[in-house]
Amino acid sequence: MIAQLQTPTTPSPKEISLLMSPREYLIWELEQPAKYGYMGGRAYAMSGGTIPHNQVAVNLVSLLNAHLRGSGCKTLSSDAKVGITENGPFHYPDVSVTCDERDRTARSHIQYPCLIVEVLSNSTEAFDRGKKFRHYRRIKTLQEYVLIDPDAMSVECYRLNDRGKWELTHYIGSDETSSDEEPVQVELTSVDLSFPIEALYENISLSETEASELLETDRSETNKA
C-alpha cells in the first residue's frame, strides 16, 4: 500500500530543564550514565525498550551488515547519535546507515545517513512519527525512514520520491502464510536490500490478534482505494 505522508500530533519527550548549547550538550552527555537526545536547547531522556524491540533491531542490523559488508557503508545501532546539523537536534535512532565519506571518521555522531529506522513503542510512537520525523526530513542525504512494529509484522517505509515528496509503502506479514504463498518482501531501496519480512521477527513471539487486525485494516484500506 502506498500513501502520502500524514503528520500526527506529537507530545514532547521528557526534557532536562537546563538550557545548553550544542557543544555543552555533547560534553555533558559524555559524563552521563544514560543516553540523552537534544533539541530546542535541552537534552531529553531516552526510554528503554522491550526484548522484542531490541531483537527486531538486532535482526535488522544483522541483515544490513551481511548485505553491506565491503561496500564502505556503516550500519549503526541505537548507541549512535544522528545530528540533523552540527548544532542539532540530536537523536538516537534504533538503526541507521551512512555511506557518506563525511561520516567516515565520525566519533560522537553522524550527520549524513541515507537510512534511519525506528522500532516503535507505546511511549515514543507519536514522537517517532511526528517531531522526530520532521527533524530527520531536514537531512539532505536521507532517502528512507522506516518504522517497525515489534509486536506484529508491520513495516512502514517512507521513501523520498523524485518529486521531493515522502511516500509510504506499508509491508504487512502474517504467521498464517501458507507454503504456496509468496512471502512479503521488504524493500529498502536506499541500500538496495530486499528480504522477507519474517527475517525481522526471528526469535520473537508475535501476537496473532494484532497481526490479524493489521491485515484486516490493510484489506479495508485497499478496498477503499
Set out the residue ranges of the language-model regions.
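Gly/Pro/Ser/Thr-rich low-complexity, intrinsically disordered segments predominantly at protein N-termini
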Residues: 1-225
